[in-house]
Regions:
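Hydrophobic/anchoring residues in structured secondary elements
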Residues: 14, 30, 97-100
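Juxtadomain coupling helices with adjacent low-complexity linkers
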Residues: 46-72
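Conserved beta-strand segments that form the floor/walls of ligand-binding pockets within enzyme
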Residues: 7-8, 32, 44, 76, ...
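Regulatory sensory and allosteric helical modules in signal-transduction proteins
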Residues: 1-23
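Flexible coil/turn and secondary-structure edge motifs
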Residues: 71-240
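A short, aliphatic-rich beta-strand micro-motif
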Residues: 27-34
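Sensory-domain boundary capping and coupling elements
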Residues: 34-47
Length: 240
């Protein structure tokens, strides 16, 4: 599915699962999908024939319905270079989906080359969707803190720049409370503040396809994380 975004349709009244017709008599099936307080997707079938509903539309509707009623939750981690971070989270039992992209900058739909200049405000980021019955947000945040150098500002391994800053981005207040508790406990034990930023997710743009699952496609590719870090993810015990 395309990037999650809010879609505004002018001069049309929206009712979930109902037909909405614009002034140009353009027929649509519009399904606003609310996911913990925000629109996750809108199904928009552009056809003058109300009976037109193909296989692509059916699959899209199934995905939208899954997002709306499914138990999975979403969280976004900025952890330096996103190649290794994606591989790390994919190894965690209970993580059901990951994708890499750029988060919380001001440039709209940036390319990797644009983000690389450090002039877009974006951080390299991994979108993680997980099953909370198998792995908790608390455990994911603790794993994240063990994966990164949490006291290094704008630098992870040999990668340096604001695009490599560390952060956790959430889409609801309940998650913020959990993250604050975990991060606060970690900082208290360490006796100092971390460089990890905690913010609501303002935007996330999926990176180019060649960045997705990069280390699966390129097993010998660059990665700043050690093999021991990946073992930490692989051996994460299931939630009781």
């Amino acid at each position: 599915m395309e990037r999650e975004r809010t879609v505004i349709v002018p001069d049309v009244e929206l009712f979930p699962g109902h037909i909405a017709c614009s002034s140009e008599s353009r027929s649509e099936i519009v399904v606003p999908c609310w996911k913990r307080g925000r629109i996750a997707a809108v199904l928009d079938i552009d056809s003058k024939d109300l009976n037109t509903f193909d296989e692509v539309d059916r699959k899209y509707l199934e995905e939208v319905t899954s997002l709306l009623y499914g138990k999975e939750r979403d969280i976004w981690f900025a952890a330096g270079c996103f190649w290794g971070a994606q591989k790390f989270f994919k190894l965690v039992d209970g993580v059901v989906f990951t994708e890499v992209g750029f988060a919380n900058g001001w440039e709209i739909d940036p390319t990797y080359k644009q983000v690389y200049t450090d002039e877009t405000g974006h951080a390299e980021c991994v979108h993680v969707r997980y099953d909370p019955e198998k792995v908790s947000l608390e455990r994911l945040v603790n794993l994240f803190l063990n994966m990164i150098d949490p006291f290094s500002l704008n630098k992870q391994g040999e990668d340096e720049g604001t695009r490599y800053r560390t952060g956790v981005y959430y889409d609801n207040g309940e998650d913020r409370e959990v993250i604050e508790t975990v991060l606060g406990s970690f900082e208290n034990k360490a006796g100092r503040k971390s460089a990890v930023e905690l913010q609501p997710l303002r935007c996330f743009y999926k990176a180019e396809e060649y960045h997705q699952n990069y280390l699966d496609k390129n097993p010998g590719g660059y990665c700043h994380l050690s093999p021991a870090i990946f073992e930490l993810a692989r051996k994460t015990p299931k939630e009781q």
